[in-house]
Swiss-Prot record:
Protein family: Belongs to the phosphoglycerate mutase family. Ais subfamily.
SUPFAM superfamilies (UniProt xref): Phosphoglycerate mutase-like
One biological process term in Gene Ontology: lipopolysaccharide metabolic process
Location of this chain's protein in the cell: Periplasm
UniProt protein name: Lipopolysaccharide core heptose(II)-phosphate phosphatase
GO molecular function per UniProt: phosphatase activity
Enzyme Commission numbers on file: 3.1.3.-
Main localization, broad class: periplasm
Length: 212
């Protein structure tokens, strides 16, 4: 079976029950260890790097949610500007992540919650790309699923990048996979929408940071 076929089975067949779905993900991990850039996190979530994400995006549009970059008010590093925003180091980290991401996923719509730190993170992640600020992305219960589905319905064939907050990502991982996820700055989750439902595919991580 081709790699693309495995990803199609693992991520696109929403009718699979959770146990069978987990078995398929285990098979995916085994195959990934032989030649793809995928691995498993200690929390049990599949880890997906930008190369694997690009292949996944060929199967269906993806939704990637990132935590914002380093906060100014919780760091001794130099602030970019506003104390409620991010640090200069945070801008550099966001730009580096954005360059690597855009090299493999160049076409996506960009959103952020309505805080200075998420807006700055999104702006530095993708300089020049139109950013849409949506206050619903600050709400981290079931409301965030409604927001994701609404954004995806506006452009069903487009990939989406969202800058949000650690408690949102923690909630999604626990709610969708019963996984304990404590994201660091610029950590992310990969999701997709299928037939009106939102699915969590795994944790996003750069290839250099994955243990294969």
């Amino acid at each position: 079976m081709s790699i693309g076929g495995v990803y199609e089975l693992a991520f696109c067949r929403s009718s699979l029950k959770s146990k069978k779905y987990f078995i398929i993900l285990l098979a995916l991990a085994a195959i990934a260890g032989l030649g793809t850039h995928a691995a498993w996190s200690s929390n049990g979530l599949p880890r997906i790097d930008n190369k694997t994400l690009a292949r996944l995006a060929q199967q269906h549009p993806v939704v990637v949610l990132f935590r914002h970059a380093e906060r100014c008010d919780r760091s001794t590093n130099q602030c970019l500007s506003d104390k409620t925003g991010i640090t200069v180091k945070g801008t550099q980290d966001a730009r580096e992540l954005g360059n690597a991401f855009s090299a493999d996923i160049p076409d996506f719509d960009l959103y952020s919650s309505n805080t200075v730190r998420t807006i700055q993170s999104a702006t530095w992640f993708s300089a020049g790309k139109k950013l849409t600020v949506d206050k619903r992305l600050l709400q981290c219960g079931n409301e965030i699923y409604s927001a994701i589905k609404d954004l995806q319905s506006k452009a069903p064939d487009k990939n989406i990048v969202i800058f949000t907050h650690n408690h949102c990502l923690t909630y999604i991982a626990k709610n969708k996979r019963d996984a304990t996820f404590k994201p660091d700055y610029l950590d992310g989750l990969v999701m997709h929408v299928e037939k009106g439902k939102v699915y969590l595919d795994g944790e996003f991580g750069n290839a250099a940071n994955l243990l294969i």
